[in-house]
Amino acid sequence: MAESLEEAKQEVRQLRAQLDQWAKAYYEQDAPVVEDHVYDEKYARLLELEAAYPELKSADSITQRVGGEVNSDLPKVEHPVPMLSMGDVFSKEELAEFDQRVQKAIGHPVAYNVELKIDGLSLSLEYEEGCLKRASTRGNGQVGEDVTKNVKYIKDVPQKLPKAITTEVRGECYMSKEAFAKLNQERDEAGESIFANPRNAAAGSLRQLDPKVTKKRQLSTFIYTWINPPAGIDSQHQAICEMAKLGFHTNENGRRLENLADVYDYIDEFTKKRDSLPYVIDGIVLKVDDLALQADLGNTVKVPRWEIAYKFPPEEEETVVREIEWTVGRTGVVTPTAVMDPVRLAGSTVARASLHNPDLLAKLDVRLGDTVKLHKAGDIIPEISEVVLSKRPEDSVPYEVPTKCPSCGEDLVHLDEEVALRCINPSCPAQVEEGITHFASRQAMNIAGLGPKIVKQLIAKDLVHNVADLYYLTADDLSQLDHFKEKSINNLLVAIDQSRKNSVELVLFGLGIDNVGGKAAQLIARKFKNMSKIASASVQELTAIDTIGMTIAESLTAYFQQEEAKKLLARLEEAGVNMDYLGEDGEAADNFFKGKTVVLTGKLAHYSRAEFTKKLQALGAKVTGSVSKKTNCLVYGEDAGSKLAKAEALDIPRLTEAEAISKIEEKDTEK
């Protein structure tokens, strides 16, 4: 405890500022910066100080508020009945104290309905005459966000009830462990930041402005509260059973328990079972079962007096660091990973944990041979929390961060005050390998059959040095690969050829430009329509696009200023790779050739017949070999013969090769 009022005042001020910052990151940005147990410890300390020094209590203290402020672009919703937070405890002794307070207020022992504490986002569902009218988040408890359009894509939320009742239910929106792993894998492959845990993935997915994003994210719900339930429903346990009959997804693990001893057994049971559940839980919730007694006990300004959450302590194990590996990513970032003695943690065997960057490595002061404490962030991602200094070997020496790239041996650098360590050699084998693999990935150019192992062989046999080289591969080249027979060769060549027709946003994303993820590439392509305009766009023009910030804009402009990038784009275009935006549904954006039947004739000076055909097809044209009344346009080069004469006779519009190229580059909307 602080020794004086002045010391307490200073500590309270610091705690409130820190907790406000952490709460903003957690509730409003869906991006936690500390583990839950760290936040809980600081919060408990603030409560302790405010209790010891009542004069320091303040209405604007985080201990007197619910959740976070509502500052998103989603419509705002005022809750008719406030969505309160929940008090929490961290030991069975504190749970016993809660039980004693309840018994003292009621005058006798009570039964509890005990439920699993799902790690998700609070959700309200309002129904009118049995139809879903509105769905909203908790927000600050008084005002939340309208997420009705998004909730319609959550499969287990009934859009219509079997009874035409007007009511409100509340529960938790969450993401299963399987859906979370799949989402993070897709985001990682797409070059986007991964979510720290399923709770934040669920929150970020539910609070999307675009419901189509929510639809892809596989969210689920557990409903556990009925606001003003119908007459005849007298208990929490009964309310859950009746909500299940109406079609709501309720958790089957809830139980009505008569005494605290049974509650302790329940805690012990699910402490052991939590890792095997398909969703993340971070504790159990104890609720007075009798609804009338709940009403008698009432609420504080922030939490109900009739319920409490018991939070599981963070599960930690000790293990020994044997090695620190450094891997090079496609953008040149070099990442350290601790290789440890395998240890069983939270339901799986863990032997590796990312150390993210040299700054974190230095902050933790991890050394070879160190015993470290390991936990899983959000019960999913292994992390080292601290070094057990009492077990550090006597001959231990500080770990020296490498100065040379582990792949190419070039110097490693820090760019513009980044914490990341980078290799800036564009010919670095690891970067080339990662870059080509990314370009061929399902989220980018989707070249089936071109995985990491094949890419590694292509590089090892000196067949490719960059992504453009893929489009110049021949059957003879591919025959040099191990276990690659005629069928595999043909399939890969077909897949590479098909990728030429992709829309330009896939090419842009496939280039692996730092900070440019799949969504950003799509927004940029939609705005500028073709690669030429994208490459010449200024930072100001790029940041004028909604959600495109300075980081992305500066990365993009810096990339296109490089001579190597200009050469690469030229070779891709020469290979017939489409450089135009084909629209939302893969259809060509409006242009002169869209929807027209075109015939090519004569000797073409700028492109081969095949290359010109691919360009026209990418713009939505149909290219045929003969002139007829159905032909809409003839493009001719030197020494054009009978096809030009026939087109003139049928009065079919005719363009020289130069005129056609001009039309392609203009992308005008002339019909």
Swiss-Prot record:
Protein name per its UniProtKB record: DNA ligase
SMART domains for this protein: BRCT, HhH1, LIGANc
Gene Ontology terms describing biological process: DNA repair; DNA replication
Reaction it catalyzes: NAD(+) + (deoxyribonucleotide)n-3'-hydroxyl + 5'-phospho-(deoxyribonucleotide)m = (deoxyribonucleotide)n+m + AMP + beta-nicotinamide D-nucleotide
Sorted UniProt keywords: DNA damage, DNA repair, DNA replication, Ligase, Magnesium, Manganese, Metal-binding, NAD, Zinc
Biological role stated in the UniProt entry: DNA ligase that catalyzes the formation of phosphodiester linkages between 5'-phosphoryl and 3'-hydroxyl groups in double-stranded DNA using NAD as a coenzyme and as the energy source for the reaction. It is essential for DNA replication and repair of damaged DNA.
The protein's required cofactors: Mg(2+); Mn(2+)
Metal-binding among keywords: yes
Pfam families found in the cross-reference section: BRCT, DNA_ligase_aden, DNA_ligase_OB, DNA_ligase_ZBD, HHH_2
Binding annotation for Zn(2+): 405, 408, 423, 428
Disulfide bonds: none
Residues at which NAD(+) binds: 36-40, 85-86, 115, 138, 172, 287, 311
Family of this protein: Belongs to the NAD-dependent DNA ligase family. LigA subfamily.
Cellular component GO terms, alphabetical: cytosol
NCBIfam families noted in UniProt: dnlj, PRK07956.1
Active-site residues, record numbering mapped to chain: 117 (n6-amp-lysine intermediate)
GO molecular function, one term: metal ion binding
Gene: ligA
HAMAP family: DNA_ligase_A
Domain BRCT: 588-671
InterPro entries: BRCT_dom (IPR001357), BRCT_dom_sf (IPR036420), DisA/LigA_HHH (IPR041663), DNA_ligase (IPR001679), DNA_ligase_AS (IPR018239), DNA_ligase_CS (IPR033136), DNAligase_adenylation (IPR013839), DNAligase_N (IPR013840)
Species whose genome carries this gene: Lactobacillus delbrueckii subsp. bulgaricus (strain ATCC 11842 / DSM 20081 / BCRC 10696 / JCM 1002 / NBRC 13953 / NCIMB 11778 / NCTC 12712 / WDCM 00102 / Lb 14)
